[in-house]
Amino acid sequence: MADYEKQKMNAAIKAAEYVRSGMIVGLGTGTTSYYLINEIGRRVREEGLKIRAVCTSRRTEDLAKQNGIEVIQGTKDQIDLTIDGADQVGMYGTLIKGGGGALLREKIVAYNSKEMYVIVDSRKIEAAHFGSFPLPVEIVPFMHMRTLENLRGICTQTDLRMNEKGEPFVTDNGNYIADMHMGMIDDPINLERSLKSIPGVVEVGLFNGIAKRIFEGTDEGCNIYSITNSGIKKEEVYFDP
């Protein structure tokens, strides 16, 4: 049986090797990103690595500070490298993100980065079934019921995300999340454009043409893929010694 936690850790540790002193680094949100933050923190303590980090959520910021990583709230300079997880990866490197509720900040940080690397376990690359993971859409609370109905005009099975108390999940930006159960996404570029044309939609959890590399953790190590115009191309297979 696959050890998905080990796979996440292997992907995160390998991607962390690309972080160098002097960089401004975007840090993602989610379980795989937390392995990354712990590994960067280890390098800060043991190797004297010096970076500044832009964090995509309060949870990420808290963990980064606990690991001794310098956190900045923003920068006018371009971020050198962002490393983040993904809920699903499609054939041409399109991502579904936002399962952790941080998609708006994640997209702002990724868009303003020279490069974005994605760290995932072996379940996340779904070229043939892209869209089987629910697509998160961040919406403003005002008139949110109407916004949901407008989203249902595109996908009838669209639900408002709730927290453990049965109340609407609230993002760090004070917004709500709608989860769209698309089943299959054939044209992510036009889908994103259509969704963002709906008033009340803040951001969509589709990342088109942003990621440059994918680190797919395995039980033995990590597969590294580059994203090209023709699709995902395997660069390297790394085995954990």
From Swiss-Prot:
Pathway: Carbohydrate degradation; pentose phosphate pathway; D-ribose 5-phosphate from D-ribulose 5-phosphate (non-oxidative stage): step 1/1
GO molecular function, one term: ribose-5-phosphate isomerase activity
InterPro entries (alphabetical): NagB/RpiA_transferase-like (IPR037171), Ribose5P_isomerase_typA_subgr (IPR020672), Ribose5P_isomerase_type_A (IPR004788)
UniProt xrefs under Pfam families: Rib_5-P_isom_A (PF06026)
Enzyme class, first EC level, given as a word: isomerase
Record field: transmembrane: none
Active-site residues, Swiss-Prot/TrEMBL: 106 (proton acceptor)
Residues at which substrate binds: 29-32, 84-87, 97-100, 124
GO cellular component: cytosol
EC number of the protein: 5.3.1.6
Entry-linked SUPFAM superfamilies: D-ribose-5-phosphate isomerase (RpiA), lid domain, NagB/RpiA/CoA transferase-like
Reactions catalysed, as given in the entry: aldehydo-D-ribose 5-phosphate = D-ribulose 5-phosphate
Domain of life: Archaea
This protein's UniProt keywords: Isomerase
Subunit structure: Homodimer.
Family: Belongs to the ribose 5-phosphate isomerase family.
The protein's role, per its UniProt record: Catalyzes the reversible conversion of ribose-5-phosphate to ribulose 5-phosphate.
Name of this protein: Ribose-5-phosphate isomerase A
Species for this entry: Thermoplasma acidophilum (strain ATCC 25905 / DSM 1728 / JCM 9062 / NBRC 15155 / AMRC-C165)
Gene encoding the protein: rpiA
